[in-house]
Amino acid sequence: MKDKYSLSRAENIFVAKKLFYEAIHCGAKLGDTNITLPETMTILNGVNVPNVTIDDIQTILNMRDAWRYVLKSVDDTFDLNYICSLNSYVSRNESIEWGVLRKGNVGIGGTNFKPKIPVESEIKNGIDDILTQDISVTDKAIKLFLFIARSQMFWDGNKRTSLLSANKILISQGKGVLVIPEKILNDFHIRLTDFYESNDYTKIDSFLYENCIHGIDYEQVEEQVENEEIDI
């Protein structure tokens, strides 16, 4: 699959900031929170929301901080250490440990797939294999997203960490933003479960490419990119 977008750094950062609330809400939903987009926006604006649990608020704030980190570290080297740094934001105060590879077994709800305990050298090789393939940046980002999610490298926050990792790759190369719209989350989870059990990327990669990679229309947004500031 070819890249859908070819954006300047300023344009891609602009897209990421425009989708900031949606991106955080997407991550929170991947973390199995029971929270709406308006509630997410209210929390991010510093206002308490009745009936939202402390755990869900923690998830939202962790995703906010993780996204801020991505946008400030776009030019940093992407490797396992960077992925661990993302997880240290994502899973802060939510897990046994955060920012380090898990040392015990975990299960994944809704599937019979049992990920093995991660071996650092194997994880590094898996990442390198994807990043050195002769494929588009978008294809690399999608494959990386799926590889990290399926590997279950951490005690918690694996899908959120994989989402942020993919976006680091996309934004650094001006190839858009990966955000899964809430209306297709159920379909996404069905396909992701199939991928977990089969390790067949074709179960889901085209779905993500067609529905979840977002960019800008040059003609409509050229002037706006230069003039608009978005506070995150």
What annotation goes with each model-predicted range?
Residues 1-232:
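FIC/Doc superfamily catalytic core
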